[in-house]
Swiss-Prot record:
Motif (DEAD box): 311-314
Record bears the keyword Phosphoprotein: yes
Protein name listed in UniProt: DEAD-box ATP-dependent RNA helicase 14
Location of the region described as Disordered in the Swiss-Prot/TrEMBL record: 47-139, 528-619
Ranges where the WW domain occurs: 17-51
Entry binding sites for ATP: A202, K203, T204, G205, S206, G207, K208, T209
Catalytic activity, as annotated: ATP + H2O = ADP + phosphate + H(+)
Length: 619
């Protein structure tokens, strides 16, 4: 599918005889960046290694006894390959392309051959994942703010060599470029592999998807059901975007294990989804609404489900899916393992966790009682007059580095569409919201992932469903209805260890959120603008005086047209009509006239940004 085409493809660089052995040069075809890889230590870096700094070799496997997981038959590969004998019948919505990344040697001393499951194999020799693996479990937990409760809980698995995963699965993980487990993976994997129920509370972008998928793959090795009689694993997610992305991860990392997965979501024809179920699927990823529809049609059986995952449980409850979730769970055997992942821990989520889980272990990453933003994201809060928002937005887009992907959030579908029309000509923007059909949404997301449309304008429907790893910036054109949605929106950037930027336009009508926003900013060590503090202090708006961005004006009237003001100059409010876009009074009287693309500038066009250049290239 097109989703996999957007993934990075890594190839070897031309041979460089000046590189010290065993270093090799690699090129990321997506970005064109050259970096260097040491196959002995699995270290990658952008700085060219020099002979004066020889690479550090590590023993094949060296695992601290404090984090060693006992290898039992529970994690061993099956003794026969009957489980996977129907490979040609398996459901796969993605092509069986080769894995990207450098190859791993087979047949070396203490190495691994190419034997499939069922044949004798040994564990993959892996390098040490220093410095994390050099820490004690207690120090690792303190560093990553991991707290656990629920009786005897095993220590975190701080390196991949400590997991005891099958070699084929480890190759998939390593070829994806991961050097060490994320904190949520390190702590949830050993608990899940014990067969215990889990409540995991962690921010978005923490690696939770693999946190439950990989133990699920191991579960499938032990529970060898006939997938034509029904799935063994069920993953419930709030949105179709998130559901399809979970399926993509399941197919990508389960390919070598011949694990089949299908996805059930609304907004698409039921026919292809029903045919996938008839062919058989080990894993079903579904939104609650569509799964309930298919259950009522009696076209799926959940009697074989023994591994249930509720991903973004808080979001599903916010969207009103609790009745559907409870109805689905009634169809699943009570003898099962249940894993719940959530970004927040409100009373509603606690209640459903108490009802559905049995003696769970709770894993917290960071402060659970307070809503906390990702500290890897630099947050910019700007008090902006409604008539100045688009001008400021264009400046932000022009300031981004070449290749940057940007998401802009609006409050309403109407605002989303209008802003997209205004930005398309210059920046290459596309809209995604609830009124778009599934083919339209898929096309927009594929264009965004590939970079052909580098600006995505979205309503909150995409705030928690979209997972694109290289988003550089998020712009809150409209402030959301609460700080929870604010945190989820900006969490689209700064994922998987990367940094990001979030720009938020804050107005007089948003002043009721000022106090809560200050807590979020201070909790993430971010600067709080004086105007926001003033709003919080007096409980009123901060735009009663002239601000840096323009004169006082009325609220944007969420869903109206007033949010699309004239293009006032960033430095001066006297130059608004210089390019034909500054007729604020005409715009307010007849907004329909301004839905067209802007006329050419009478004073000359500014230099093209990367986004404009990309649009010209692809026309």
């Amino acid at each position: 599918m097109a989703a996999t085409a957007a993934a990075s493809v890594v190839r070897y660089a031309p041979e460089d005889h000046t590189l010290p052995k065993p270093w090799k040069g690699l090129i990321d075809d997506r970005t064109g960046y050259l970096y260097f890889w040491n196959p002995e230590t699995n270290v990658t870096q952008y700085e060219k290694p020099t002979p004066s700094l020889p690479p550090k070799f590590s023993p094949a496997v060296s695992v601290s006894s404090s984090v060693q997981v006992q290898q039992t038959d529970a994690y061993a590969p099956p003794k026969d390959d009957d489980k996977y004998s129907r490979g040609s019948e398996r459901v796969s919505r993605f092509s069986e392309g080769g894995r990207s990344g450098p190859p791993y040697s087979n047949g070396a001393a203490n190495g691994v051959g190419d034997s499939a499951y069922g044949a004798a194999s040994t564990r993959v020799p892996l390098p040490s994942s220093a410095p994390a693996s050099e820490l004690s479990p207690e120090a690792y937990s303190r560093r990553h703010e991991i707290t656990v409760s629920g009786g005897q809980v095993p220590p975190p698995l701080m390196s991949f060599e400590a997991t005891g995963f099958p070699p084929e699965l480890l190759r998939e993980v390593l070829s994806a470029g991961f050097s060490a487990p994320t904190p949520i993976q390190a702590q949830s994997w050993p608990i899940a592999m014990q067969g215990r129920d889990i409540v995991a509370i962690a921010k978005t972008g923490s690696g939770k998807t693999l946190g439950y998928l990989i133990p699920g793959f191991l579960h499938l090795q032990r529970i060898r059901n006939d997938s034509r009689m029904g799935p063994t694993i069920l993953v419930l997610s709030p949105t179709r975007e998130l559901a399809t992305q979970i399926q993509e991860e399941a197919v990508k990392f389960g390919r070598s294990s011949r694990i089949s997965c299908t996805c059930l979501y609304g907004g698409a024809p039921k026919g292809p989804q029903l045919r996938d179920l008839e062919r058989g699927a080990d894993i079903v990823v579904a939104t609650p609404g569509r799964l309930n529809d298919i259950l009522e049609m009696r076209r799926i059986s959940l009697r074989q489900i023994s591994y249930l995952v509720l991903d973004e449980a808080d979001r599903m409850l916010d969207m009103g899916f609790e009745p559907q979730i409870r109805k689905i769970v009634k169809e699943i055997p009570t003898k099962r393992q249940t894993l719940m992942y959530t970004a927040t821990w409100p009373k509603g989520v606690r209640k459903i966790a108490a009802d559905l889980l049995v003696n769970p272990a709770q894993v917290n990453i960071g402060n659970v009682d307070e809503l906390v933003a990702n500290k890897s994201i630099t947050q910019h809060i700007e008090v902006v007059a409604p008539m100045e928002k688009q001008r400021r937005l264009e400046q932000i887009l022009r300031s981004q580095e070449p290749g940057s992907k940007v998401i802009i959030f609006c409050s309403t579908k109407r605002m989303c569409d209008q802003l997209t029309r205004n930005l398309t000509r210059q920046f290459g923007a596309a809209a995604i919201h609830g009124d778009k059909s599934q083919p339209e949404r898929d096309n927009v997301l594929n264009q965004f992932r590939s970079g052909r449309t580098p600006v995505l304008v979205a309503t909150d429907v995409a705030a928690r469903g979209l997972d694109v790893k290289d988003i550089r910036a998020v712009v809150n054109y409209d402030f959301p209805n609460g700080v929870e949605d604010y945190v989820h929106r900006i969490g689209r950037t700064g994922r998987a260890g990367a940094t990001g930027q979030a720009f938020t336009f804050f107005g007089d009508q948003d002043s009721k959120h000022a106090s809560d926003l200050i807590k979020i900013l201070e909790g993430a060590n971010q600067r709080v603008p004086p105007q926001i503090r003033e709003m919080a202090t007096r409980g009123g708006g901060g735009m009663n005086k002239f601000s840096r961005w323009g004169p006082p004006s009325g609220g944007r009237g969420r869903g109206g047209d007033s949010g699309y003001g004239g293009r006032g100059s960033f430095a001066s409010r006297d130059s608004r009509s210089s390019n034909g876009w500054g007729r604020e009074r005409e715009r307010s009287r007849s907004p329909e006239r301004f839905n067209r693309a802007p006329p050419p500038s009478s004073t000359g066009s500014p230099p093209r940004s990367f986004h404009e250049t990309m649009m010209m290239k692809h026309r």
